[in-house]
Design a protein with these regions (language model features):
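N-terminal membrane-targeting hydrophobic helices
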Residues: 2-183
Length: 183
């Protein structure tokens, strides 16, 4: 399903602005030096856009068609293979592979968090980038909880957790983006 047509998705501009803001806030409060702040801010913008990579309208997919091709190919393959599963399990697997599925759960930021110790012996730039990715990703999930909901608890539940239902391009979306740009 394409939630954008229904007006239930935040825009990529809003996600990238909020991710950027989240990265800057974390950088400020952790006292990151200049290069690490840049890495964290860059990671947070990418992290803010990453969950929508499974959407045909994603900013990342539109700029890097090969990434979109790989993601959608994997989705189709999983959906095809799920055809051999019992109906209820098949429906759950298919709901996890569509937009606002697995990539909109807490599994992704948890996996990134688990990767932090692996890159712990680097010069700090990579770590700052990954922390930014986590911040941007979490900001994306929070925003999408305001616009249709997200299945945060996959694989335990595919139920969407929603706080309210702002519309794409609506006044709240635009106002929020303005606050993030100038906040």
């Amino acid at each position: 399903k394409d939630n954008r047509r229904k007006g239930r998705s935040m825009t990529g501009k809003t996600h990238s602005a909020t991710g950027f803001f989240a990265g800057l806030v974390i950088s400020h409060y952790t006292g990151c030096p200049g290069a690490m702040t840049l890495a964290m801010a860059t990671g947070s913008v990418l992290g803010g856009l990453l969950p929508d990579i499974d959407n045909v309208h994603s900013q990342i997919g539109n700029r890097l068609p090969v990434v979109e091709l790989i993601v959608h190919g994997c989705q189709r393959g999983i959906r095809l293979l799920s055809g051999i599963l019992p109906r209820k399990l098949r429906e759950n697997v298919r709901s996890m592979t569509g937009h606002r599925g697995l990539l909109h759960s807490l599994l992704v930021p948890a996996a990134m968090l688990l990767a932090l110790p692996v890159i712990g012996n680097t010069n700090g730039i990579e770590k700052a980038f990954l922390i930014g990715m986590i911040a941007g990703n979490l900001s994306h999930l929070i925003l999408d909880m305001l616009s249709g909901g997200v299945p945060l608890l996959i694989p335990f539940s595919v139920a969407r957790i929603r706080v309210c239902n702002f519309r794409t391009g609506g006044i709240m979306d635009k106002l929020w983006r303005l606050v993030m740009y100038f906040g």
